[in-house]
Amino acid sequence: MEKEKGEEKMNDSRKITVIGLGYVGLPLAIHFAERGYNVVGLDKDKRKIERIEKGDSYIPDVSSNVLKDLVQNKQLVVYTPHTGIEEFQNSEYVIVTVPTPINKQKEPDLSALIAASHYIKQNLQAGQTFIFESSTYPGTLEEVIIPIIAQSGKEVGKDYYIGYSPERIDPANQQYTVQTIPKVISGQTERCKQQVQKLYSTIFDTVVPVSSPKVAEMCKLFENIQRLVNISLVNELNILCEKLGIDFREALEAAATKPFGFTPYWPGPGIGGHCIPVDPLYFQWKARQLGQSSQLIEVAHMINEKMPQQIVTQVKELSAPPGTVFLIGIAYKKDVNDLRESPALPIIELLVNEGYKVQYHDPYISSAKIGDKIYDSIPLKKKTLEKADCILIVTDHSNIDWNICKGMKHVIDTRGVLKKVSA
């Protein structure tokens, strides 16, 4: 059988480069390093590079002790893109996990993905395999990424290989880990897909090949579109049931006893994080390019956007400005230090605009810039809560003793956590 171009070029099949060392990239880099791969991490944020080199993790799911050991043993080395070119060129596999947010117009911001593609174009070596994991709309790999890399003069499927495998990670989830979550993979050609599978089958328990990158890209969006629609539904029903004098959580718990045909979703202050509020808007943007739109996504997004104002309205019903509102938890979900798209951000800005004084406690976020002001987390003490005019539970962190809220007046529990506190 004739070897394809580049097969003899690569000489270090155990070297992996991960571009982007955030909530997806760093745990993935650690996972590879722990399984014997020599891992190179690239990130333009010099502060991240410095912290990794010191063995100081900035992600709760990554142990500083583990990180320090891997760095000291040279199983994980980190650079900025500029200083890590040689290491990049000596890697057989390159995995891209850069952020794909939305801009102020609620449209896809592919700037980091495009920058990574240009970096690959400029430094590509024959025989390398590139795997993109960043969440994006269907067609991005074929219509945006590959045309940029093609400017190198190299041919996909012959000179280099490329595929898409949507990131699947649930921060703070101890049940489903990087290794155990099934991994969907795809390739631009059959050989590309084989290259992706060759690597990922060594570190993931289950690999799920699909027919094309577009299918894999859509898979990721569909997962989060489903969650947006269902969580927005229960948030709306929760509001309506309150006006009807019905305990919606009790009704939901009762409905959840049905062993078939029902999946429970739980209401809250609004959907946060980088994925669920963002990915559906990527799909909507792509649909609009074709003159189409999803009405269901549109309505679900609108409901989610209105949730912070709904919470502030509840606060105003209990306490008038210029009272003090004390937020417990500001991260977008429990047990993480991630503020991205957290409903706490617009809630705090709305409260300040109404004239309230705002304080917060979050065991994972010591300080946060919200609007034009920097807030510092205040220790959670009974005296502090007693002085507040309203207590607003936004994030139900596991390491908070919720008994401290018992007996307090004017508590808004957006997570239903106090129902679980023993009497």
UniProtKB/Swiss-Prot annotation:
<protein>
    <recommendedName>
        <fullName>UDP-N-acetyl-D-glucosamine 6-dehydrogenase</fullName>
        <ecNumber>1.1.1.136</ecNumber>
    </recommendedName>
</protein>
<keyword id="KW-0520">NAD</keyword>
<keyword id="KW-0560">Oxidoreductase</keyword>
<feature type="binding site">
    <location>
        <position position="48"/>
    </location>
    <ligand>
        <name>NAD(+)</name>
    </ligand>
</feature>
<dbReference type="Pfam" id="PF03721">
    <property type="entry name" value="UDPG_MGDP_dh_N"/>
</dbReference>
<keyword id="KW-0119">Carbohydrate metabolism</keyword>
<dbReference type="GO" id="GO:0051287">
    <property type="term" value="F:NAD binding"/>
</dbReference>
<dbReference type="InterPro" id="IPR036220">
    <property type="entry name" value="UDP-Glc/GDP-Man_DH_C_sf"/>
</dbReference>
<comment type="similarity">
    <text>Belongs to the UDP-glucose/GDP-mannose dehydrogenase family.</text>
</comment>
<feature type="binding site">
    <location>
        <position position="24"/>
    </location>
    <ligand>
        <name>NAD(+)</name>
    </ligand>
</feature>
<dbReference type="InterPro" id="IPR028359">
    <property type="entry name" value="UDP_ManNAc/GlcNAc_DH"/>
</dbReference>
<feature type="binding site">
    <location>
        <position position="135"/>
    </location>
    <ligand>
        <name>NAD(+)</name>
    </ligand>
</feature>
<dbReference type="GO" id="GO:0000271">
    <property type="term" value="P:polysaccharide biosynthetic process"/>
</dbReference>
<feature type="active site" description="Nucleophile">
    <location>
        <position position="275"/>
    </location>
</feature>
<dbReference type="InterPro" id="IPR014027">
    <property type="entry name" value="UDP-Glc/GDP-Man_DH_C"/>
</dbReference>
<dbReference type="Pfam" id="PF03720">
    <property type="entry name" value="UDPG_MGDP_dh_C"/>
</dbReference>
<dbReference type="GO" id="GO:0016628">
    <property type="term" value="F:oxidoreductase activity, acting on the CH-CH group of donors, NAD or NADP as acceptor"/>
</dbReference>
<dbReference type="InterPro" id="IPR036291">
    <property type="entry name" value="NAD(P)-bd_dom_sf"/>
</dbReference>
<dbReference type="InterPro" id="IPR017476">
    <property type="entry name" value="UDP-Glc/GDP-Man"/>
</dbReference>
<feature type="binding site">
    <location>
        <position position="100"/>
    </location>
    <ligand>
        <name>NAD(+)</name>
    </ligand>
</feature>
<comment type="function">
    <text>Dehydrogenase involved in the biosynthesis of the nucleotide-sugar UDP-N-acetylxylosamine (UDP-XylNAc). Catalyzes the conversion of UDP-N-acetylglucosamine (UDP-GlcNAc) to UDP-N-acetylglucosaminuronic acid (UDP-GlcNAcA). Cannot use UDP-glucose, UDP-galactose and UDP-N-acetylgalactosamine as substrates.</text>
</comment>
<feature type="binding site">
    <location>
        <position position="43"/>
    </location>
    <ligand>
        <name>NAD(+)</name>
    </ligand>
</feature>
<feature type="binding site">
    <location>
        <position position="340"/>
    </location>
    <ligand>
        <name>NAD(+)</name>
    </ligand>
</feature>
<dbReference type="InterPro" id="IPR001732">
    <property type="entry name" value="UDP-Glc/GDP-Man_DH_N"/>
</dbReference>
<dbReference type="Pfam" id="PF00984">
    <property type="entry name" value="UDPG_MGDP_dh"/>
</dbReference>
<dbReference type="InterPro" id="IPR008927">
    <property type="entry name" value="6-PGluconate_DH-like_C_sf"/>
</dbReference>
<dbReference type="InterPro" id="IPR014026">
    <property type="entry name" value="UDP-Glc/GDP-Man_DH_dimer"/>
</dbReference>
<dbReference type="GO" id="GO:0003979">
    <property type="term" value="F:UDP-glucose 6-dehydrogenase activity"/>
</dbReference>
